[in-house]
């Protein structure tokens, strides 16, 4: 079976890879950071701005779009690309992470997850089949398995049956997938911070490999120590199929991103850059900058003196601080624009470094300055 999403490695430097993912809506150069458009919009950003900052792919959220405005409505309106006027690739998550984050509002059963809406308390049920059906309706280029997401520091006793359920659910997702010719399905490797359990999860999913266009690493950056995340990435990523893209879910901190790339990760996403931006925190080459701070009240410098984004070319720290302090929408837009640009550019620079066989030096130099060491 020819898969609708393919990957080609162009260059390697150690384990780090520069490549190209091909989808029906275009190509994606990797490594890549993917802005998150939870409710069919990347918060505060227009399509034109997303293209301007170099976005090649964005995320949509299955859980949120199922609740509002509803996946069937989006399908009737021509699918998610048409609905949000975005003609480049889209990845949809399965809704699993959001449903499992509901805590007491959800009940896990073998058939799926029963939950109450965080909006109005209405009762809902998402199964592996339902998750795939929603994603088929949305019409994204990359769809994700519906997996069980164990909490950050879960015990082995909790994780073993959880992995086995994820494998059973994976089989059901594969069978339910109605658009295998146009939507690439990604597997999700779980296993917490235990190397042997990560291996178990990957081994079980690999038995269905011909159905998967890529492999995601789930269940990291959920509260475990950083060292554990790096150790697991270092162990499991290179064991994923070489000829398919590898996606680290939910990571958007610059240092973590570069360490992930070093382990062989190709794709990452996170709400962090826009969430931090809305609270007045921005990324710079010298680390995070809290723009609300009094010290920037009369600062005429740009957010990052070495950044060539539209915001840094046109606005001062003092002005952006003022906007954030008085809660003007433009402030949120400018900080969001800059943060997303920063992470997308970081991955483009990492790609160049890999192609020029200087990634390790690039990474160490960036981290040393970013962490002020």
Swiss-Prot record:
Q: Does the UniProt entry include the keyword Glycosyltransferase?
A: yes
Residues covered by region (RNA binding): 250-256, 274-278
Cofactor(s), names only, from the UniProt record: Zn(2+)
Q: Which GO terms describe its molecular function?
A: metal ion binding; tRNA-guanosine(34) queuine transglycosylase activity
One GO term of the cellular component aspect?
cytoplasm
Residue positions annotated to bind Zn(2+) are: 307, 309, 312, 338
Q: Which UniProt keywords apply?
A: Glycosyltransferase, Metal-binding, Queuosine biosynthesis, Transferase, tRNA processing, Zinc
Q: How is the cofactor bound?
A: Binds 1 zinc ion per subunit.
| Active site residues according to the UniProt entry | 93 (proton acceptor), 269 (nucleophile)
Spell out the subunit comment.
Answer: Homodimer. Within each dimer, one monomer is responsible for RNA recognition and catalysis, while the other monomer binds to the replacement base PreQ1.
Q: Of which family is this protein a member?
A: Belongs to the queuine tRNA-ribosyltransferase family.
Name listed for the protein in its UniProt record = Queuine tRNA-ribosyltransferase
Q: Which organism is it from?
A: Fusobacterium nucleatum subsp. nucleatum (strain ATCC 25586 / DSM 15643 / BCRC 10681 / CIP 101130 / JCM 8532 / KCTC 2640 / LMG 13131 / VPI 4355)
Q: Source gene?
A: tgt
């Amino acid at each position: 079976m020819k898969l609708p999403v393919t990957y080609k490695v162009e260059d390697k430097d150690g384990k780090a890879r520069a490549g190209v993912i091909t989808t029906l809506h275009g190509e994606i150069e990797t490594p890549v950071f993917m802005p998150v458009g939870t409710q069919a919009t990347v918060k505060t950003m227009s399509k034109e701005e997303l293209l301007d900052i170099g976005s090649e792919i964005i995320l949509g959220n299955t859980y949120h779009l199922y609740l509002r405005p509803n996946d069937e409505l989006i399908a009737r309106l021509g699918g998610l690309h048409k609905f949000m006027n975005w003609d480049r690739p889209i990845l949809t998550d399965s809704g699993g992470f959001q449903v499992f984050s509901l805590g007491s509002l959800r009940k896990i059963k073998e058939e799926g997850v029963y939950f109450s809406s965080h909006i109005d308390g209405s009762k809902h049920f998402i199964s592996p089949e339902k998750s795939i059906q929603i994603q088929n309706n949305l019409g994204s280029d990359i769809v994700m398995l519906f997996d069980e997401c164990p909490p950050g520091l879960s015990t082995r006793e909790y994780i073993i049956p959880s992995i086995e359920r994820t494998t059973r659910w994976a089989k059901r997702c594969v069978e339910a997938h109605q658009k295998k010719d146009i939507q690439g399905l990604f597997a999700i490797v779980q296993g917490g911070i235990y190397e042997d359990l990560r291996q178990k999860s990957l081994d079980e999913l690999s038995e269905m490999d011909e159905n998967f266009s890529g492999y995601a690493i789930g269940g990291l950056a959920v509260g475990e120590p950083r060292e554990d995340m790096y150790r697991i990435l270092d162990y499991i990523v290179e064991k994923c199929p070489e000829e398919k893209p590898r996606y680290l879910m939910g990571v958007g901190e610059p240092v973590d991103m570069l360490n992930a790339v070093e382990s062989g990760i190709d794709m990452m996403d996170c709400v962090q850059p826009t969430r931090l931006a809305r609270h007045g925190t921005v990324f710079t080459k010298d680390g995070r900058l809290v723009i609300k701070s009094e010290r920037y009240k009369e600062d005429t410098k740009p957010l990052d003196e070495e950044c060539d984004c539209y915001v840094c070319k046109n606005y001062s720290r003092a002005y952006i601080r003022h906007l954030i302090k008085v809660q003007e929408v433009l402030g949120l837009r400018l900080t969001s624009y800059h943060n997303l640009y920063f992470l997308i550019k970081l991955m483009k620079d990492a790609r160049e470094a890999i192609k020029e066989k200087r990634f390790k030096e690039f990474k160490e130099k960036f981290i040393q300055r970013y962490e002020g060491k």
